[in-house]
Amino acid sequence: MIEPDLETVEPDLAPVGPDLEIEVEQRLLAVFDFDGTITRHDSFVPFLKFAFGQRAFSVRMARLVLPSLGYLAKRLTRDELKGRLIKAFLSGVEVQWLQQKAEAFCQSHWKRLMRPAALESIAAEIEKGAIVTLCSASPAMVLQPFADRLKVQLIGTNLEVIDGKLTGLIEGSNCRCDSKVARLESVYGPLSQFRVRAWGDTRGDHELLAAAQDAHWRLFHPTWRRGRYKGPVNAKLHNPDGNDGPTR
C-alpha cells in the first residue's frame, strides 16, 4: 500500500488537528434550572399547599412568620430559611407519600406551571443529542416526575431519609450557587469535557451560567420581565440585557 504524501494532500483532506479533535469529541451538556426558568413561578411552595391542603398549609406557614422576618432582617440566610420550611412540613413524612403527591402535583399542575418555549428548547436539546439535565434547588423527590415526563436527568436538593421517612433535614447542601456546579461535576465529571449550555433566572444560577460556554438569562420570560443580568462578567451570555443578543 502506497502511503500518501501529507504535504500534497488537499487542505480539506488534511488530518484533523488536535484542537479540532477535542471540539468534535466534546459532548453537549444542556443544564436547565427549574423554578422560574422553565416554569412560570416557584413550584415548591405551591406543591406543599397542594400536598397538605389549605388548612394544614396555613398552620405550618404561620410557624414560619418569625423565621421569615429573621431572613428579611438578614439574621437568617436563604438556605437556613429553606431548612426551616422543609423541617416544618416534611419532618416524619413517609417517602412513598411524598412521591405519590409529587406525581399527582406534576399531572395536575403541568400545563399551568411549565413555559411552552422552555419545553420546546428542552426537546430541541434532546434532538441534538445533548445530555439534558434539570439542576434545581428544589427537592429532587418533588421534581422527579417532571424530569421523568421530560425524559431528562435530574440534580436537585436531596432530603435525608431514615427508615423510609424524611427527617426534615437536607442531605448535603442546598443545590444552588457553587453547589450547582459541584453537583454537576460529581455526576458528570469535569465540565471541561463538555460544551455546556445553561439556562437560569436568579442569583442561584450565576455560577452555573459562568461555567457554561453558552449561557441564557431568563430566556423564556416575557421580555419586559427579564431584566439585566448582574452576575459574573465572565459568563458567556447570549442575552445579558434580557434580550436575544449576540454572545458577549
Segments predicted by a language model, with ranges:
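A general structural signal for well-ordered alpha-helical segments in protein cores
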Residues: F44-V45, K82, V181
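Active-site neighborhood of HAD-like aspartate-dependent phosphohydrolases
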Residues: G17-K74
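C-terminal cap/substrate-recognition subdomain and adjoining C-terminal extension
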Residues: M1-P15, D19, Q26-R27, Q100, ...
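Metal-dependent phosphoesterase signature
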Residues: L81-P116
